[in-house]
Amino acid sequence: MSIQVCVTGLVAYLSQKLGVTFYLLGILLCLMVIDYLSGMAASAVEALDHPDDKSYGWSSRKGAKGIAKKVAYLFVIAVGMVIDYVIIQTSGVLGFNLPNTMLSLLVTVWYMLNEALSITENAGRMGAPVPEWLMTVSYTHLRAHETLSD
């Protein structure tokens, strides 16, 4: 059996089991890559703008931390999927049937929005004009995220 057949079978299986979340995970992965690359580019621009300040510029430590954070996103989404599965399986015992739940879907969309805002912030760091209202939304999101992290 060829690798293409195996990959096609796996994609079909995951698509059937995860539904729309499968496609959103694909979009999230693309956003994660774009965010990482735009963060590297923004750091490079800042290093050029501040050549004498070592606090600016790309850092492998920050890069590794960013990758670890993105992997942690996937872990949290996996936990949401497990909780969805448990709710679906136990709902029948409780006397009602749920065809699916949305916890993993909501978590995935939340992380997609987080990545999109981060890409926007990176564009602003590179000097791209960003609408003021969008930066306000981004700042509000950042403050809420910091509050949740504490």
Residue ranges and their predicted role:
Residues 2-12, 29, 70-84, 105-115:
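Hydrophobic alpha-helical transmembrane segments of multi-pass integral membrane proteins
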Residues 16-23, 89-97:
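Helix-coil boundary and interhelical linker segments in multi-pass alpha-helical membrane proteins
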Residues 26-39, 113-119:
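Hydrophobic alpha-helical membrane-embedded segments
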Residues 36-49:
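Membrane-water interface of transmembrane alpha-helices
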Residues 48-55, 132-138:
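Juxtamembrane inter-helical linkers in multi-pass membrane proteins
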Residues 50-73:
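Juxtamembrane helix-capping/reentrant segments at transmembrane boundaries
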Residues 104-135:
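Alpha-helical transmembrane segments and their immediate juxtamembrane interface regions
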Residues 141-150:
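Single conserved hydrophobic/aromatic residue that forms the stacking wall/gate
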